[in-house]
A protein has these predicted regions:
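Thiamine diphosphate
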Residues: 1-73, 89-90, 94
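Glycine/aspartate-rich loop-and-adjacent alpha/beta segment that forms the canonical ThDP
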Residues: 59-116
């Protein structure tokens, strides 16, 4: 998890130990990632969801639901970056499913601070 569209830069959501262009090998990310969903839930916004591009039906369902809700909505969508991950583009769907299946990136919804 990083800012892939700006050159694989570290973000507060980048996991501990991750490599990015702004965290060189000798200085990998030394702090745990921020739990962005928990931060949003603490503010009791109307809708928070996590989704993965490996499960497009779930992603579309949550996007549609978010569009129908008034107020602040937060979607954290996991999409592997072949350049940042040094992986093959054809493995993107497989990788995005593996992170969910192995509990690295759980998919869920939170409404008004309550997890479902």
């Amino acid at each position: 998890e990083a800012y892939m569209n700006t050159g694989i830069q570290r973000s507060s959501a980048t996991p501990y130990g991750a490599w990015t262009t702004t965290t060189p090998v000798k200085h990998f990310k030394e702090r745990p990632k921020k739990d962005m969903e928990a931060i949003m839930a603490a503010h009791r916004i109307p809708y928070i969801a996590t989704a993965s591009t490996g499960y497009p039906e779930d992603l579309f369902k949550k996007t549609k639901k978010a569009k129908e809700i008034k107020g602040t909505r937060f979607l954290h969508i996991y999409a592997p970056c072949p350049t940042g991950w040094k992986s093959r583009p054809e493995d993107t769907v497989k990788l995005s499913r593996m992170v969910v299946q192995n509990g690295i990136f759980p998919i869920y919804e939170i409404e008004w601070g309550e997890k479902y």
